[in-house]
């Protein structure tokens, strides 16, 4: 089990939840500190910049584990730096395969700069590999997901891809969505971009992608398997694990 946290973005936090987005990094840091206090069984008396908790709350049962790894999803330079300082693992976002190795290396350097051992932090893959016979359908679903995040989930995802050199593709997707809606935006996503982020294919293709991610520094892989029965799924997972 891991605990996954992230700041989300201003559009979701302010328009959906109805609360101010900033200071998002301070809020996230305090979440991490509070969760660790609770799991350690300490009385919850916390004096942060945003949260002040005085009642000394404790869990009414002993946790099975006193420490659950906290992974943080982050993509802006400030949030990635904070992740290196406080998290047990990093969930990178919107990093195509060809950019993965330098981005992971840069993160591990931030961990060193924070005085921590980079080998003790786990980096999860930024995109899933899906073993499926319905490759075209899976690719279209990934295109729809990517187009929606680029156009409707705030600036961070769009800016991340622009930073990595995909400004033209991002502009085309946004223009198509504005003019033709979801279907047009989805159709504008280049095959090469979506496949570098979310691979769907045969077991062999997915094994190759997992190996490429591992070579780029990924420790934990996100895998989906579409199989007819549990025995087939186990065999596929065994091949992916190698």
Locate each region found by the language model.
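Active-site-adjacent structural elements that line small-molecule/cofactor binding pockets in enzymes
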Residues: 1-242
């Amino acid at each position: 089990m891991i605990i996954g946290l992230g700041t989300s973005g201003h559009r979701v936090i302010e328009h959906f939840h109805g609360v101010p987005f900033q200071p998002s990094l301070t809020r996230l840091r305090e979440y991490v500190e509070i969760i660790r206090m609770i799991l350690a069984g300490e009385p919850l008396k916390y004096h942060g910049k945003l949260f002040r908790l005085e009642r000394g709350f404790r869990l009414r049962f002993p946790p099975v584990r006193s420490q659950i790894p906290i992974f943080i999803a982050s993509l802006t330079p400030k949030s990635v730096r904070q992740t290196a300082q406080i998290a047990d693992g990093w969930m990178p976002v919107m990093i195509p395969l060809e950019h993965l190795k330098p981005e992971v290396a840069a993160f591990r350097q931030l961990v060193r700069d924070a005085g921590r051992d980079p080998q003790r932090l786990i980096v999860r893959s930024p995109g899933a590999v899906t073993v499926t016979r319905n490759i075209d359908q899976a690719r279209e679903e990934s295109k729809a997901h990517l187009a929606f995040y680029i156009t409707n989930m705030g600036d961070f995802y769009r800016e991340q891809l622009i930073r990595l050199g995909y400004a033209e593709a991002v502009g085309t997707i946004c223009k198509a969505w504005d003019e033709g809606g979801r279907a047009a935006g989805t159709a504008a996503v280049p095959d090469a971009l979506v496949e570098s982020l979310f691979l769907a294919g045969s077991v062999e293709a997915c094994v190759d992608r997992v190996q490429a991610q591992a070579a780029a520094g990924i420790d934990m892989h996100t895998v989906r398997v579409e199989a007819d029965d549990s025995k087939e799924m186990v065999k596929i997972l065994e091949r992916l694990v190698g």
